[in-house]
From Swiss-Prot:
GO terms for biological process: ribosomal small subunit assembly; translation. Required for maturation of 30S ribosomal subunits. This is Ribosome maturation factor RimP. It comes from Pseudomonas syringae pv. tomato (strain ATCC BAA-871 / DC3000). It is found in: Cytoplasm. It holds the Pfam family RimP_N. InterPro entries: Ribosome_maturation_RimP, RimP_C, RimP_C_sf, RimP_N, RimP_N_sf.
Length: 158
């Protein structure tokens, strides 16, 4: 996996390059994830739209994004491009997305320990400035958004 600032700058570069393409096609760019394990890298682009995303939507976006990536060549290593909907276990990338899903159960993994922990699972209470508020059992944690590596909604079936 890329480390710290390198990840942030690579993601910012990809976001700036690819999000406008997704938006121009009529979709919301929900988020971008770029991960690398050994020699294999994966670029995941999550798209959304009113009424949901179909396989054809992913194919349309994938073709356009592939063209941009071929021309701009922002990734120097081999990688796999994946375009998908956020799905039921929707990943959360921005402070606005965390605010939108307040009241939902979440799973959060941090880049480095916070109060002795890296993994949190509990109720997303909301946001306070640049902190995500999560209640785990009877304890509330204010997690700095910059420390969050991955966060997903945990679907509940009532």
């Amino acid at each position: 996996m890329y480390e710290g600032v390198q990840v942030s700058s690579k993601l910012e570069q990809l976001q700036g390059l690819l999000a406008p393409v997704v938006v121009a096609l009529g979709y919301q760019c929900w988020g971008i994830d770029f991960s690398s394990q050994g020699k294999h890298s994966v670029l995941r682009i999550y798209i959304d739209k009113e009424g949901g995303v179909l396989v054809d939507d992913c194919a349309i976006v994938s073709r356009q994004i592939s063209g941009v990536l071929d021309v701009e060549d922002p990734i120097s290593t081999e990688y796999t491009l994946e375009v998908s909907s956020p799905g039921m276990e929707r990943p959360l990338f921005t402070i606005e997305q965390f605010a939108l899903y307040a009241g939902e159960q979440v799973r959060i993994k941090l880049r480095s320990p916070f109060e002795g922990r890296r993994n949190f699972q509990g109720l997303l209470r909301g946001v306070e400035e640049q902190d995500v508020v999560v209640q785990v059992e009877d304890h509330e944690f204010l997690l700095p958004i910059d420390l969050i590596d991955k966060a997903n909604i945990i679907p509940t079936f009532d």
